[in-house]
């Protein structure tokens, strides 16, 4: 016996053809003919008759899917009663009659328990005869007699076959097709009341403002003999997509020609949600309306200047060099008002923090009152890519702009490589190094090229400071260009000019453009005043601005006057008093409530100028175990430490101590120049007792473990003598050679050798150790081939160590990273470590503290070596001299 599933297919709009093509010559052939299988809703008794037909069928056991259909039926009944209240008596009388009906023969009972017969009857599903029945909901518009019905109930017949007395249901093979028919027609109120809220497998069909979006889902059973129908359906679907493409093109023309007044009169039937698609532009994800074509986006932002447009250089020929008319020209062209957007190619690659950073740059640099800002994003977070994207958008919209990028000389190749990777148009990148412009005349020639065409100029910090501070006549022209022409100044590693007493900070402050951007992965270095020196660079007299005055007064009020007097003295100015007060409160105050108030005020006064990103993307990496390993010194080392404490010069203590803590024999080299020959070092290494130097012994045990585990090691130090010593120790102990297993990077390494060493170390399976001067391996260095890091000494600036660890713990790292900060116990180095940690606390509290941290004091965690979770520390040889182990 056949069963028929009654499913409401949506707003069916003539997509599937009928099984039999009935073609008549007369006009009446196109009208829907009434039959026993058609229910005409223009008949007032149609609903009543349909419900009676539904309720008079046979009943079967209810599965989960059939329950849904039964629920759909009940929903239709309720809405029909709401539309025709007179049906209520008929329906409820039918329900009473259903309780007294007996189960018809031939119905499969899927429930084994006789006790559940009552439930089965309650969940009975209406079954209509085995022939397919179609219900057409006709329009109430009687004038349009030839209009086909918009809504259709189509039944699906599922055959059951008997095999050896058992009844086995044949599982229907259903196909699902989604047809978007665009905007629907206005519905008569009666039909709208019936259809509104109907469900297709529990999903409500949307009706907005009385207009039906004719977007339906056809659910049917594929028939073996329906090849012709499938081909016809495919042809119809193809026509639909063609019609949609035509509609989109038509909508573009209408959008351009419609006036603003006419647009205001149009009643929107869609709450648009626009998204950016690379091939179309800003498109509504709901209805497909294009707000802005991709061609318009590119034309506005990335068109080249017209030939009849004067260049920046030609316009200044009639004026004295350096006049401020350059800024006036920007204002006339709308630079202060016009918005800026990232190129679609860049936007598709941006992460959320980069998108937020791009918008932050626009709010400061492209505004009515432009000013500088600080982008303090974590190392490896993509600051370079973000600012490259901004500069290309900036230049595309304002081709006359002159960007100047000042950065450490060593990372210039990295910047150029990134520019080539992300360029959307060919913008010349100029610098003095590649052009070998060594004298002022050659440098002036490069600067004139930069002025005359759309390009970007790169200079090193030292080079910029030297030119600006040069008093010779040859430098005057170069100085005038560098100080007056730049329209935007980018400072990578922007914490470099943090000392107010240096020529570098003073020379950068003389650049006249208000658009200055500082990029830094470690903004806080040593002291609070250094951060405010950088703030004063991008926003002159920052503490005296109206946005800062109230916060400054509140912060000063938190500290008693006698404490402020002891900190700064009676003759100190307000800025010095403020900086010392903040540093003392965050570092030494025992009242955590006061610390929180200071943090909140600091963030309030800098929120529009400073954009901070901690680096949550690092959580996606395999992980970081940052250990501080305090070692017990050998007797000979302790004797040398006693002598070292008599030294009053702090730098001397640090330099000599770094050698002694590694091995006492290195003391003889600490006073000499860094140029120690391999032969001299080899002779000393062959004679020494390794047990006398705990750090040297730790290093040798560590490289043995790394070699066995197939992991690569990074070794960082502030000084070259320790690096040279360990390089020769590894060569003699393991037979490793420089350039194959061992690589070295210092401040004297050329750019070409620098790039080659990084690429070879990361890619070569033979590479074992990379020795690096910790200051030379700053931003722009990626050494993700290594998974173990050894820090030999304690830089007084804690951010230097953080950057060194960031060389390996950054995007691209595939392994868990373990860092070991070696500390000589009972020595001045242990005291330096405590001082550095207090500086770290200030940075963490200022930028990273939140209400979820509670009243924690940011102390490092002391852990047992056995519970460190590091297999290397389980080695007896490696853990032999460990006195205490900390973990950040």
From Swiss-Prot:
Source organism superkingdom: Eukaryota
Binding site for ATP: 377-384
A Pfam family the protein falls into: Helicase_C
Keyword Coiled coil: no
Phenotype upon gene inactivation: Reduced association of NRPE1 with chromatin, leading to altered chromatin binding of the DDR complex. Defective in RNA-directed non-CpG DNA methylation resulting in reactivation of silenced genes and enhancers, whereas methylation of centromeric and rDNA repeats is unaffected. Reduced accumulation of 24-nt siRNAs and reduced DNA methylation of siRNA-directed DNA methylation (RdDM) target loci. Increase in CpG DNA methylation leading to abnormal maintenance of some silenced genes.
GO molecular function, one term: hydrolase activity
Residue interval(s) of motif DEAH box: 492-495
Record's subcellular location: Nucleus
Chain positions of motif Nuclear localization signal 2: 305-312
Domain Helicase ATP-binding: 364-541
Keywords: ATP-binding, DNA-binding, Helicase, Hydrolase, Nucleotide-binding, Nucleus, Plant defense, RNA-mediated gene silencing
Motif Nuclear localization signal 1, chain ranges: 17-24
Domain Helicase C-terminal: 701-866
InterPro entries reported in the protein's UniProt record: CLSY/DRD1 (IPR044567), Helicase_ATP-bd (IPR014001), Helicase_C-like (IPR001650), P-loop_NTPase (IPR027417), SNF2-like_sf (IPR038718), SNF2/RAD54-like_C (IPR049730), SNF2_N (IPR000330)
GO cellular component: nucleus; pericentric heterochromatin; RNA polymerase IV transcription regulator complex; RNA polymerase V complex
Intrachain disulfide bonds: none
Signal peptide residue numbers: none
Record-level GO BP terms: cellular response to exogenous dsRNA; defense response to fungus; DNA methylation-dependent constitutive heterochromatin formation; gene silencing by siRNA-directed DNA methylation; heterochromatin organization; positive regulation of chromatin binding
Membrane-spanning intervals of the chain: none
Family of the protein in this entry: Belongs to the helicase family.
Function, as annotated: Subunit of the chromatin-remodeling complex (DDR complex) that mediates RNA polymerases IV and V (Pol IV and Pol V) recruitment to chromatin. Cooperates with Pol IV and Pol V to regulates RNA- and RNAi- (RNA interference) directed non-CpG de novo DNA methylation on cytosine of genes targeted for silencing and enhancers, also known as siRNA-directed DNA methylation (RdDM), thus leading to epigenetic modification of the genome and promoting/maintaining heterochromatin.
The protein's assembly and partners: Part of the chromatin-remodeling complex (DDR complex) that contains at least DRD1, DMS3 and RDM1. The DDR complex recruits/activates the RNA polymerases V and acts during siRNA-directed DNA methylation (RdDM). Interacts with SUVH2.
Name this protein carries in UniProt: Protein CHROMATIN REMODELING 35
């Amino acid at each position: 016996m056949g069963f028929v599933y009654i499913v409401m297919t949506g707003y069916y709009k003539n997509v599937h053809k009928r099984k039999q093509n009935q073609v008549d010559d007369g006009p009446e052939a196109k009208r829907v003919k009434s039959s026993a299988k058609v229910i005409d809703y223009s008949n007032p008794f149609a609903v009543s008759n349909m419900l009676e037909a539904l309720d008079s069928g046979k009943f079967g056991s209810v599965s989960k899917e059939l329950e849904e259909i039964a629920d759909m039926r009940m929903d239709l009944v309720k809405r029909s009663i709401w539309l025709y209240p007179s049906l209520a008596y008929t329906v409820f009388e039918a329900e009473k009659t259903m309780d007294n009906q007996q189960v018809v023969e031939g119905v499969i009972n899927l429930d084994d328990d006789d006790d559940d017969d009552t439930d089965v009857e309650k969940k009975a599903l209406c079954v209509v005869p085995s022939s397919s029945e179609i219900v057409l909901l006709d329009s109430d518009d009687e004038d349009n007699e030839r209009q086909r019905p918009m809504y259709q109930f189509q039944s699906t017949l599922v055959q059951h076959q008997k095999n050896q007395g058992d009844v086995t249901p044949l599982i229907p093979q259903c196909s699902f097709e989604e047809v978007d028919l665009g905007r629907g027609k206005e519905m008569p109120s009666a039909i709208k009341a019936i259809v509104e809220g109907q469900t297709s497998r529990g999903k409500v069909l949307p009706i907005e403002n009385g207009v039906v979006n004719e977007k339906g889902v056809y659910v049917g059973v594929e028939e073996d003999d329906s090849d012709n129908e499938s081909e016809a359906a495919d042809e119809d679907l193809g026509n639909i997509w063609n019609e949609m493409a035509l509609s989109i093109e038509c909508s573009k023309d209408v959008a351009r020609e419609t006036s603003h007044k006419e647009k205001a009169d149009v009643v929107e039937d869609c709450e648009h949600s626009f998204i950016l698609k690379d091939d179309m532009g800003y498109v509504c994800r709901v209805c497909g309306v294009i707000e802005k074509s991709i061609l318009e986006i590119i034309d506005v932002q990335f068109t080249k200047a017209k030939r009849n447009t004067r260049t920046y250089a030609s316009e200044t020929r009639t004026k004295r060099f350096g006049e401020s008319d350059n800024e006036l020209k920007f204002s006339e062209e709308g630079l202060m008002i016009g918005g800026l957007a990232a190129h679609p190619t860049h936007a598709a690659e941006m992460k959320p923090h980069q998108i937020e950073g791009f918008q932050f740059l626009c709010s400061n640099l492209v505004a009515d009152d432009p000013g500088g800002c600080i982008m303090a994003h974590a190392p490896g977070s993509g600051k370079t890519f973000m600012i490259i994207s901004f500069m290309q958008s900036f230049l595309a919209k304002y081709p006359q702009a002159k960007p100047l990028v000042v950065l450490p000389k060593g990372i210039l190749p990295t910047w150029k490589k990134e520019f080539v990777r992300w360029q959307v148009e060919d913008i010349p990148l100029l610098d003095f190094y590649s052009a070998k412009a060594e004298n002022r005349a050659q440098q002036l020639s490069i600067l004139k090229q930069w002025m005359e065409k759309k390009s970007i100029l790169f200079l090193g910090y030292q080079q910029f400071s030297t030119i600006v501070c040069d008093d010779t006549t040859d430098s005057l022209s170069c100085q005038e260009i560098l100080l007056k022409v730049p329209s935007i100044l980018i400072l990578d590693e922007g914490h470099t000019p943090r000392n107010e007493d240096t020529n570098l900070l003073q020379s950068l402050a003389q650049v006249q453009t208000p658009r200055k951007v500082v990029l830094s992965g470690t903004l806080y270095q040593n002291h609070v005043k250094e951060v405010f020196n950088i703030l004063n660079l991008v926003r002159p007299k920052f503490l005296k601005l109206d946005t800062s005055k109230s916060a400054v007064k509140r912060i000063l009020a938190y500290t008693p006057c006698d404490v402020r007097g002891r900190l700064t003295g009676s003759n100190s100015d307000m800025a010095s008093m403020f900086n010392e007060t903040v540093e003392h409160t965050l570092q030494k105050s025992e009242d955590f409530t006061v610390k929180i108030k200071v943090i909140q005020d600091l963030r309030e006064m800098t929120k529009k100028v400073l954009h901070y990103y901690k680096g949550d993307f690092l959580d996606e990496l395999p992980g970081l175990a940052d250990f501080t390993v305090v070692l017990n010194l050998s007797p000979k080392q302790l004797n040398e430490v006693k002598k070292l404490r008599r030294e009053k010069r702090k730098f001397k203590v640090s330099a000599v101590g770094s050698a002694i803590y590694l091995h006492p024999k290195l003391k003889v080299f600490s006073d000499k120049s860094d140029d120690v020959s391999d032969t001299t070092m080899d002779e000393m290494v062959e004679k020494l007792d390794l047990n006398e130097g705990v750090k040297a012994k730790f290093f040798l045990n560590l490289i043995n473990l790394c070699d066995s585990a197939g992991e690569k090691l990074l070794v960082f130090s502030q000084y070259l003598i320790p690096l040279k010593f360990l390089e020769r120790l590894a060569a003699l102990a393991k037979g490793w050679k420089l350039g194959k297993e061992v690589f070295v990077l210092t401040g004297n390494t050329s750019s070409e050798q620098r790039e080659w060493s990084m690429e070879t170390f990361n890619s070569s399976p033979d590479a074992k150790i990379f020795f690096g001067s910790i200051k030379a391996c700053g931003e722009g260095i990626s050494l993700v081939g290594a998974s173990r890091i050894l820090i030999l000494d304690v830089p007084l600036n804690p951010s230097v160590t953080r950057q060194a660890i960031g060389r390996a713990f950054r995007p691209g790292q595939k392994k868990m990273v373990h860092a070991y900060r070696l500390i000589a116990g009972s020595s001045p180095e242990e005291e330096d470590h405590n001082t550095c940690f207090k500086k770290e606390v200030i940075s963490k509290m200022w930028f990273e503290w939140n209400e979820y941290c509670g009243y924690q004091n940011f102390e490092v965690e002391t852990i047992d070596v056995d519970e460190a979770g590091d297999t290397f520390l389980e080695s007896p040889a490696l853990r032999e001299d460990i006195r205490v182990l900390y973990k950040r």
